[in-house]
Amino acid sequence: VSSIEYSGLFVVLEGIDGSGKTTISKMLVDRLNGLGFKAEYTFEPTDSEIVEVVRGKYSEYRDAYVDALTFALDRLLHLKRKVIPLLRAGFIVVSDRYMYSSVAYQAASGAPIDWVLLVNKYALKPDVTIYLDVDPETGLRRKQFKATRFPEFEVIDFARRVREVYLELVKRGLMISINAARPIEEVYRDVEAVVLNALSKVPT
């Protein structure tokens, strides 16, 4: 599914926990729909049976490699079930995390960056990937009183390693970095500007 034809736009927001991804993703979808576009919010990892089984029945076997392959399969099904049909129907799909989350988190857990990238080599490439950069202390402070699906990833030293991998991916030109330590409205304006610029280049 690495190269398909579609008339929509695939937008991904990445960042450590507490960077504001979910809030800004939903703000963006609401705004785009208000402007007359067709926009849809989605997220990864999904709530598929695959992820839940590995986190449950097979949790004792989890490591960076098992997680990377689990999330890659979850991603493929997510693409086939939801993302690609929406893109072909002309939607702007805004995904709260995608394959670069797997690269960052599984590399921070011990898998080589390039191996995780290779595992995801044939995943559909986003049209726009925005990394919301915030220091781990700020991110985890924001998440302090919020429920989380993956508490094992919310440890300060681990969050620092995750951020280092994200910054390496930015350096490789795979993502656009936006300072997310500012008020949410300021961060959102910058994100919206990037997406509207990308939309202006989509053939009509």
Task: Describe the predicted segments one by one.
Residues 102-164:
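A glycine- and Lys/Arg-enriched "phosphate-lid" helix/loop adjacent to the NTP-binding pocket
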Residues 35-121:
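ATP-dependent small-molecule kinase phosphotransfer cores
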Residues 13:
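Hydrophobic anchor at the beta1->P-loop junction of P-loop NTPases
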Residues 6-10:
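Pre-Walker A (Motif I) flank of P-loop NTPase domains
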Residues 2-4, 29, 137-204:
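NTP-dependent small-molecule kinase module
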Residues 22:
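Walker A/P-loop
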Residues 18-19:
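ATP-binding Walker
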